[in-house]
Amino acid sequence: MTTTDIKNSIIPYIGETVPYINIPENIIFNGHTIETEISGQDFSNENLTHLLKILASLGSCSLYKLLNNSSKEKIYFLGEKLRIRKLSYRPIPDTITITGGSYLESKRKGKSCLNVKDKQSGEILYSFELDYYIISQDSFRLFYKDFFNDTPIGTYDEKLPEGKINKTKDHYQLTISIMPFTLNQCKGHFENYPIVPFVFIANCVLREIFNFLGNRDIYEIDSLEGYASKAMPIGTEFQVEVFQQKFLRNLIYFKCEIKDTSGNSYAVIIINIKSETQK
């Protein structure tokens, strides 16, 4: 199965749609494993979420193939828990390969495990895991009926909302304000049920953290974990409560809880950021 096959026989039947879903042009399915490569993209700092988006899209496609669905009704793959870890501290090369696959834990849960490698040396650069809930179309519509919105969406807006760091008197605590997401920014996730993608909120949080740290070129993400507890609506201002602590001379830990202005919690992101100058 190639990228063309995936676009024709898988993507129309999963919850994510274009332009949100993002897969490379040279995918090969070999049994239950998936292989592809990417060139010329910047995954530094908050741009690591662009890689997460690609990996999550590949995981959804791989799980759909495993299900061998013949009903032609949409199946929704909702991320429960995400983990990515950097395993090499060499500079990320221009061309990387992605290999791995997905497996089913049950009819309602699945997992994707992928490695990002240096194409030339074969060295593993990142390990990635994503746990999914697998939901039928009818169940999705029932669970998320309050999100239904059939307003026609025009141009896809790739620019994410602005944010602001709010320092507190406590050295270990700060907050991040993130302006509301729009329909256009969340186009394709999911069709007629606009939900803010986890990778988008993570991008905004990381962007503000790197701005807070300053001198962005000396830092890199060592690991990132995310746990979603509730779907994030558009049109809502988010307040991110951040706890930070330097565990090692060159490693800073951040725990970020995403809430709305009423205090409702939606997700937690745990990030370890390493200073490149002291490795």
Region locations from a protein language model:
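Extended aliphatic helical segments
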Residues: V18, V116, V196-V199, V205, ...
